[in-house]
Amino acid sequence: MAEEEEAKTEANGQQQAPQMRVLGQFIRDMSFENIMAQKGAPSDAQPDVQVQVNLDAKKRTADNQYESAIKLNVTSKVKDGDATLFVLELDYVGIFHVDNVPDEQLHPFLLIECPRMIFPFLRRIVSDITRDGGFPPLNLENIDFLSLYRNELARRQSSEAPKMDA
């Protein structure tokens, strides 16, 4: 155990900086439904786009390798109406080699830093899919993964808190 700690420190006693390498990234699952074309909705309809983001991370079998996934659900509906234009579901995964991250910081690292690294590629895929589906390219805004992580932690803590009876 002490040998592992010594290996993690440099000669000057400082802890080594966290290191991350992207080993690969891929689309695990994708679905695009062009409901407008199926139902013949007017093409000049003003869209109201709703985006839902979920994150997931898990350890892989190889040492120091982790999987971080961004699960995106995009629904575009007609503004001032309830007709759906399109639905896009995308599960995008990055495989990472992570070193020098303390165990207590690993979970936030995998759900904040890793998604931040692969998000630009996911954004391009979403833009291409919507364009190829007959719509203007959907350019997603940047996602604040730190806020998303904090909000999820707060939601889980509030749902696990014991309820007081009067």
From Swiss-Prot:
Function according to Swiss-Prot or TrEMBL: One of the proteins required for the normal export of preproteins out of the cell cytoplasm. It is a molecular chaperone that binds to a subset of precursor proteins, maintaining them in a translocation-competent state. It also specifically binds to its receptor SecA.
Record keywords, A-Z: Chaperone, Cytoplasm, Protein transport, Translocation, Transport
Which is a Gene Ontology cellular component entry for this protein?
cytoplasm
Q: Which gene encodes it?
A: secB
Alphabetical list of InterPro entries matching this protein: SecB, SecB-like_sf
Organism of this sequence: Roseobacter denitrificans (strain ATCC 33942 / OCh 114)
Keyword Chaperone listed? The answer is yes
Name the record gives this protein? Protein-export protein SecB
Subcellular localization is given as: Cytoplasm
